[in-house]
């Protein structure tokens, strides 16, 4: 017997017998009814434990609509509509913010009806009328269309706020920290201020303002909705960028020989020049790793170069999917989070083996047993991998700096700028913010995957390596991004610098609180590695507990930000 909620995948829970007969008869042979009416849908709450505290994944029965209390009273009441996936709504009164129970994904019209029910019930329950409605910025979200119509009907203002900023504010509000903080907001997708897809962001934030001060390296997400499920597309796109970049630089830098020939055994570098044999072939990498056929690669490359069915993205979620595909763990996801969670499980298996090796070594030392020849072999192999990585990373960063300094136009960068200009109010130049070089990390993992033949042991070690290095990249970028941001501000406003500006710069540079948020931080391994590294670097780390880090927490961030932005604007 399987007992679960009564609903189709992606649809809200069925509330009455008539709907159950219509929608659920194909799912079961018998429908057991009851004469007690269901007034309010209530999904099961789902949570994990992190440092002996709840870490919410889905906030619903037993937790919603318990409020989040802020220290400051607000004069306005807010209705926040949330995002598109894992939707919730939040209503506010004074200093209390009430997130609703889980509504679900709004791709199904039945979920829109459930959203309307939830809004009506929350407003009635707390006897409030909103002064303002707030929603996401994405122009094609059903939640945005719903909010626009509702604001028009209620004749009240509508405020649209950036997705990842609201993730950060949600984490701040739950922890009672008004900022400023440095937010690390990693998720699958969100509409960026520059018209591209964001998802791997470093954000300077307060309750009422934000600046994007860093991100993972932008990449072309080719294939529309398919690319959200098919990680191999993201990996192939990164290989295309690698080929274009080294081809553009020509003979000005040394590149690892294995980038030219994945089968090469030597560790020596070779000079890259304009001859074909010294330019890496992304297609060779993609086919050797079993990501796609030559034909699929060529079709995708043509689409990318033409900018067809292509968006520019900094999605951290898609990077996890790509690495999972590169390692042969999941070429594509069968369900949400499939590739990323499988990658995490592989990484955890390797970490457990490292821990066991440490334990065996400790027991061996306690018994004065010196015959354990294999003791420490995993650690030795991993240290060798880290040594190779450091060498590769320095070489590839030098290549990128050389490209920038010489003003060489790389084809993929041209595509990025063109797509930005077509879709955005402004062009957010990636060269003016801190970049987390996930592209270099994926290139290295691809090389190592080819070298180890995607063996089970190799997959596990490289899975852990990915989590380990990404967390270290985040630490480095959090430390570096404020400085780069201040340098950018000083350059832009050099003719207007005064004492107030200098004090603001000092405040930005002195921030020592980091918020880890977004659905990617449901990955407990990444969250722990990043949190521990930031703490060792002297940062206070705030994370979620009773509010989900995923899009289920967005509406809280929207409501808190909207109330403070509204109040600040009316004080001016």
Q: Which role fits each region the language model picked out?
A:
Residues 191-192, 197-216, 289-299, 531:
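Flexible glycine/proline-rich, aromatic-decorated loop/lid segments
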Residues 164-186, 190-192, 231-240, 468, ...:
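Glycine-rich phosphate-binding/hydrolytic loop that grips phosphoryl groups
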Residues 78-80, 134, 181-185, 313, ...:
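Short glycine-aspartate micro-motif
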Residues 136, 155-167, 512-517, 522-524, ...:
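Conserved phosphate-binding/catalytic loops in two-lobed NTP-binding clefts
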